[in-house]
Amino acid sequence: MAKLIVSDLDVKDKKVLIRVDFNVPIKDGKIGDDNRIVAALPTIKYVIEHDGKAILFSHLGRIKSEDDKKGLSLRPVAERLSNLLNKPVTFVPVTEGEQLETAINNMNDGDVLVVENTRFEDVVNGEQVKRESGNDPELGKYWASLGDVYVNDAFGTAHRSHASNVGIASNMDQVAAGFLMEKEIKFLGDAVDNPKHPFVAILGGAKVSDKIGVIDHLISKADKIIIGGGMTYTFYAAKGMGIGNSLVEKDKIELAKSIIEKAGDKLVLPSDSIVAEKFDNDVPSKVVEGSIPDGYMALDIGPKSIEEFEDVLRDAKTVVWNGPMGVFEMSNYAKGTLEIGKFLGTLSDATTIVGGGDSTAAVKQLGVGDKLTHISTGGGASLEYLEGKELPGIAAISEK
C-alpha cells in the first residue's frame, strides 16, 4: 500500500506539525554541517507555500542531564533555517506550556515555528524521565493537540518509537510522509524489494554484529555482497585464515561461518589488506595478500581488492553501500573507502544508494554526491530498513 504524502493533504489554514531531523553537529553554537536542515526544506516550503502553518519538532543530540541542555538548543538551527528560507522563523525555547501554545495561536498562514529540542523532555528538573525517547503517551497526546495534521519527514529516527513521531501520530487522524521520508521509502524500498539486477550490496564497518541482519536479509535478494572494513577479519577467522592483531568478534565466528555457507559465491571478501603494527596513521604500513601476519593488524583493503570490487560493481544495476572499507578517519587507511565512492560515481546506468556516516562522508569529500541516485539520511534507520524490519515511524504513517 502507498503511504499518504504531504502533497496529498489540504494544508491551507491548518496547523501542520512536522517532525524533521535537525540532529546536526553543533559546537559552541555553530552548525558544522547543515545538510539535514537543507534536506527538510522541500516539505517545509510545500506547507508554507500552500498557506499552512509549519510547526517543526526535532531532537538534537542526547540529553541526560540539565547540563546537556546548554549546548543542545535548537536556536542556532532555527536561525540557519531562517537564512535558508529567507524569511523569519519563530523559535520557542520550551517544549510545552503557555509560551508555546500562545506562539502557535499567533501564527499566520505561511509562518514557520521551531519548537525547542524534543529531548529536553527526557530530563525534567534534573531527573532523567525519558518522556520523549520513552514515548510518554501524555506527551505525544499533548503535542498532537497543538496541530491539525502531522507530517513525519524524519527518516533518521523512523526506527525509534518516540513521543515526537509515533506518539503524535497515534493521536492524529491524518499522518503523512514528508518528501524526504517518501524518497527514503522509495529508494531503499525498491532496492530491497524490487531491485534491478545485478544487485550488489557493499557492507563495511567494524562489526559483523551491526550488519548481520542486513547480510542475512540480502543473501536471497542480492547477486553479490561485498564485505569490507574491520568485519572482514571475523570472516577471515571463520575461514581459518590468519588475522594477526586485526579486529575480530570471537563470539561471531560461528555466525560468520554459517553466512559463508549460506551465501556461497555471492560473498566477496577482500583478497589483500593494508596492514601496520599499530593502530596509528603515522607508522609504516604494507600490503599483504591473504592471511594477516602475526604482529600486524589490517586497517584497509588493498589495491587488488579495490580492483576486484570494481570488477563486481562494473555491471551492477542496483548498488547499496553502507559502511567504510577501512579506518576511514585515518588518511592513510581511507583509500579503499574513497576509491569505492569514486567508482560508484561513474556508474551512470545504475541506481546507487549510499548510507552510513563514513560512506556518506567519503562521497561528500569526493564531491560525487550528485552523481549518485540517493544518499540516505538515516544511519540506524536505513540499516534496519535493509534488514526488512518494519520501522515504527513509517508504520505510523497513514495509507493512501
Swiss-Prot record:
<feature type="binding site">
    <location>
        <position position="160"/>
    </location>
    <ligand>
        <name>substrate</name>
    </ligand>
</feature>
<dbReference type="GO" id="GO:0006094">
    <property type="term" value="P:gluconeogenesis"/>
</dbReference>
<dbReference type="GO" id="GO:0006096">
    <property type="term" value="P:glycolytic process"/>
</dbReference>
<dbReference type="InterPro" id="IPR036043">
    <property type="entry name" value="Phosphoglycerate_kinase_sf"/>
</dbReference>
<feature type="binding site">
    <location>
        <begin position="356"/>
        <end position="359"/>
    </location>
    <ligand>
        <name>ATP</name>
    </ligand>
</feature>
<dbReference type="GO" id="GO:0005829">
    <property type="term" value="C:cytosol"/>
</dbReference>
<feature type="binding site">
    <location>
        <begin position="59"/>
        <end position="62"/>
    </location>
    <ligand>
        <name>substrate</name>
    </ligand>
</feature>
<comment type="similarity">
    <text>Belongs to the phosphoglycerate kinase family.</text>
</comment>
<dbReference type="Pfam" id="PF00162">
    <property type="entry name" value="PGK"/>
</dbReference>
<dbReference type="InterPro" id="IPR015824">
    <property type="entry name" value="Phosphoglycerate_kinase_N"/>
</dbReference>
<keyword id="KW-0808">Transferase</keyword>
<keyword id="KW-0418">Kinase</keyword>
<feature type="binding site">
    <location>
        <begin position="21"/>
        <end position="23"/>
    </location>
    <ligand>
        <name>substrate</name>
    </ligand>
</feature>
<comment type="subunit">
    <text>Monomer.</text>
</comment>
<feature type="binding site">
    <location>
        <position position="119"/>
    </location>
    <ligand>
        <name>substrate</name>
    </ligand>
</feature>
<dbReference type="InterPro" id="IPR015911">
    <property type="entry name" value="Phosphoglycerate_kinase_CS"/>
</dbReference>
<keyword id="KW-0067">ATP-binding</keyword>
<dbReference type="InterPro" id="IPR001576">
    <property type="entry name" value="Phosphoglycerate_kinase"/>
</dbReference>
<dbReference type="GO" id="GO:0004618">
    <property type="term" value="F:phosphoglycerate kinase activity"/>
</dbReference>
<protein>
    <recommendedName>
        <fullName>Phosphoglycerate kinase</fullName>
        <ecNumber>2.7.2.3</ecNumber>
    </recommendedName>
</protein>
<comment type="pathway">
    <text>Carbohydrate degradation; glycolysis; pyruvate from D-glyceraldehyde 3-phosphate: step 2/5.</text>
</comment>
<dbReference type="GO" id="GO:0043531">
    <property type="term" value="F:ADP binding"/>
</dbReference>
<feature type="binding site">
    <location>
        <position position="329"/>
    </location>
    <ligand>
        <name>ATP</name>
    </ligand>
</feature>
<feature type="binding site">
    <location>
        <position position="36"/>
    </location>
    <ligand>
        <name>substrate</name>
    </ligand>
</feature>
<feature type="binding site">
    <location>
        <position position="211"/>
    </location>
    <ligand>
        <name>ATP</name>
    </ligand>
</feature>
<dbReference type="GO" id="GO:0005524">
    <property type="term" value="F:ATP binding"/>
</dbReference>
<keyword id="KW-0547">Nucleotide-binding</keyword>
<keyword id="KW-0324">Glycolysis</keyword>
<keyword id="KW-0963">Cytoplasm</keyword>
